[in-house]
Structures are given as structure tokens and as C-alpha cells.
Amino acid sequence: MTEKLKQGIDQLGLKVPETIQQSMLAFLAFLQKWNQAYNLTAITEIKSMITHHLLDSLSILPYLKGDKILDVGSGAGFPGIPLAFACPEKKFTLIDSKAKKTAFLLQAASRFKITNVTIIQERVGSYQPGFYFDTITCRALGSVREIMEQTNHLLRPGGQWSIMKGTYPEKELRGTDASAIVHVLNVPGLKAERHLVEVKNNKG
């Protein structure tokens, strides 16, 4: 599994220290254990988790902007946890409304000493942190328009939404901000289509 992750990270063109890669794998094992009782993810094998969770999450790393990142509907911690492992200089806030998921994330952050993450249990529409985020990201959570509307109060002017999608979201992009850019994500070992929708926040 170590080699599978290393090869995938190399194929993504990323530089992640081996010690951090080992921590990522340990996190997956921790998730697998919790998943037996709390049903946090439908993917149960470590080999598949590496592809569908770790590498999929890390594929958006080159597109992150700024130092304050919000991961909306983080669930079992994707993409937020892998990105936090890989970018210790950035501050990540992971928000989810479900108690069992935030309980897992709190335990994981403590166990693996992920000091650059903050875990919030709350609906994102009600979240008022008192500051703006530079990038808001999410995976498998609502339409592009819905995500933008629910989080508009949290993104700084000039900041960006980085929304992970499967197939090209043509219908979702109709009527959204004209500055939307769609990147094709090539996730090593993943045959399914993956895209990243980038939308700049033009509010002044």
C-alpha cells in the first residue's frame, strides 16, 4: 500500500514527505476501524481508499489558493484531511452537520496530531466564524449553485470555490458565475471521470 500511494503521488506531480504518506495510510486504517461501527464511508478496503479518497483529494492540491481553507460537508475528512497533511502551512476548517462524522474527525486530528485543522459540527448556512476563507472546497455535496449560495457569506472577495465533481457538470454550470473554470482531474488508478469547478468570488 505504501508503494501504491507513493506512485500515485508521484503521478500527480506532488511532493509529499514519506513520513506524511505513512501518516495518511495510518489515517485510513483508523477510518477503516471506525467505519465498522459508524458507517462513515462506503469504501471499506484500504487499496480503494487510497485511490478514491487520498489521491482523489490530493488531486486538487495544486489549485488551492490562500491559507484559510474551508472543507464543506467533510464527512470522513475528504478532501480536507489529506490536504491538511500535505499542506501544514495552511489552516483548514472541516465542517459537517453530523455528530458521528465530526466526532471521528476530532479523534483523528488528535490521534495524528493534525494541528492545522479545526473541526466544526454545524450546518454551513448557520456558520459564522467571524472571518472569511480564501478557498471553499467540497466533494459530493449538492449542485454548484447550491454550494455557492450556502457558503457565499464565508468566502472573501476575490476568493474561490473549488468544487469537486464527477462527470462534467454542464447543467450545473448554467447560470453560475461567468468566471467558472473547469479542470479535468486525472486521479491515478481511478477510471471514473473527475472534474474541479473553480469559481471566483467577484463580490466587492
Swiss-Prot record:
Protein name, entry field: Ribosomal RNA small subunit methyltransferase G
Organism: Coxiella burnetii (strain CbuK_Q154)
Binding site for S-adenosyl-L-methionine: 73, 78, 139
One GO CC term, this protein: cytosol
Catalytic activity: guanosine(527) in 16S rRNA + S-adenosyl-L-methionine = N(7)-methylguanosine(527) in 16S rRNA + S-adenosyl-L-homocysteine
UniProt cross-references to NCBIfam families, sorted A to Z: rsmG_gidB (TIGR00138)
Family according to the record: Belongs to the methyltransferase superfamily. RNA methyltransferase RsmG family.
CDD domains: AdoMet_MTases
Gene3D superfamilies reported for this sequence: Vaccinia Virus protein VP39
Keyword field: Cytoplasm, Methyltransferase, rRNA processing, S-adenosyl-L-methionine, Transferase
Primary localisation category: cytoplasm
One Pfam family from the record: GidB
EC number(s) per entry: 2.1.1.170
